[in-house]
């Protein structure tokens, strides 16, 4: 299938994240590059920690109730904010650079799940929320995942850098959706 793939590197650059165990950080650049070369999503990758979590093969990760059958949500193991959740597709998708125009709805659904999880946890000030993706090669897990962070006004110095809006290494969900649509 020769579907059009959006070039997110124009004007930006590198998605992924440091929210898994040490063994999952082995070959970051190689796995992100491999994912970028293969835009067709696989159902699952046995070497991917997020695929194992989605397949309920990681009993140490508590899945949060998610009303979307194609997505899972769980707390980040290294939270940068009081509320720091990851919304992850069950199907293996490498990162935000591998997304195509026809996958805008997936990203929108990820945002909806993020907002719903925040509301369920009594956080409703959406002006104080940041949702976005790390860009390759600045990712530790080469499986698409949305960071949901709140309250952002309480992020520490390093977290403000790591999750800096529309930087070389982090793109907000809204900006990604806009890029995918153009």
Curated annotation (Swiss-Prot):
The modification N-acetylalanine is found at residue 2. The keyword Membrane does not apply. GO terms for molecular function: adenosine 5'-monophosphoramidase activity; nucleotide binding. Its main location: cytoplasm. It is found in: Cytoplasm; Nucleus. SUPFAM superfamilies: HIT-like (SSF54197). The active site is at residue 145. Keywords: Acetylation, Cytoplasm, Hydrolase, Nucleotide-binding, Nucleus. GO terms for cellular component: cytoplasm; nucleus. It comes from the Eukaryota. This is Adenosine 5'-monophosphoramidase HINT3. It comes from Pongo abelii (Sumatran orangutan). The gene is HINT3.
């Amino acid at each position: 299938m020769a579907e059009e793939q959006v070039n997110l590197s124009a004007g930006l650059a590198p998605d992924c994240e440091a929210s898994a165990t040490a063994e999952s950080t082995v070959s970051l650049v190689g796995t992100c590059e491999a994912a970028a070369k293969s835009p067709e999503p696989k159902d699952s990758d046995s070497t991917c920690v997020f695929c194992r979590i989605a397949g309920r093969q990681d009993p140490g990760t508590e899945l949060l109730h998610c009303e979307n059958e194609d997505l899972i949500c769980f707390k980040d193991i290294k939270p940068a904010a009081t509320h720091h959740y990851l919304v992850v597709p069950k199907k293996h998708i490498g990162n935000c650079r591998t997304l195509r125009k026809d996958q805008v709805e997936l990203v929108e659904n990820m945002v909806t799940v993020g907002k719903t999880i925040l509301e369920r946890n009594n956080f409703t000030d959406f002006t104080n929320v940041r949702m976005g993706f790390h860009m390759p090669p600045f990712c530790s897990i080469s499986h698409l995942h949305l960071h949901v962070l709140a309250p952002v006004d309480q992020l520490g110095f390093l977290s403000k850098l790591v999750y800096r809006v529309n930087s070389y290494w982090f793109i907000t969900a809204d900006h990604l959706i806009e890029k995918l649509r153009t």
